[in-house]
Amino acid sequence: MIAIAVGVASLALRDPVAGRLEREAMRLAALLESARTEARSAGLVVRWRPVPADDRGTPAGFRFEGLPPQLKLPQRWLASEVRAEVIGRPVLLLGPEAMIPAQRVLLRLGAEQLLLGTDGLAPFAVVPETAP
């Protein structure tokens, strides 16, 4: 009985790093979809790229390229230790076409990582790392 209670309790305790990374992934998915919608509606070529931290102390972040200046989307992670890597290319292409290439971005925070992706038609979402 005690073993079952301990097992259930350990499953209920989430790793705080995993939770932070999951929040970053959900936030990034929403930002990517917002930029994708703007790209389609305005006929703009919009790209997203991760920006590494630099030697001057600027934290890692990301940049949307091609959006109108009045549309100010965030450029920093909520957790400054987050790192991102676009898989197979330097940037994500978010428009102007409704059907974009299948794309993925790997997010890392400490030892945790999550893969965010789209098949080109569906919205960006967390996908299993074993998915093609």
Language-model features: locations:
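N-terminal helix-rich module
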Residues: I4-S41, V45, P50-P132
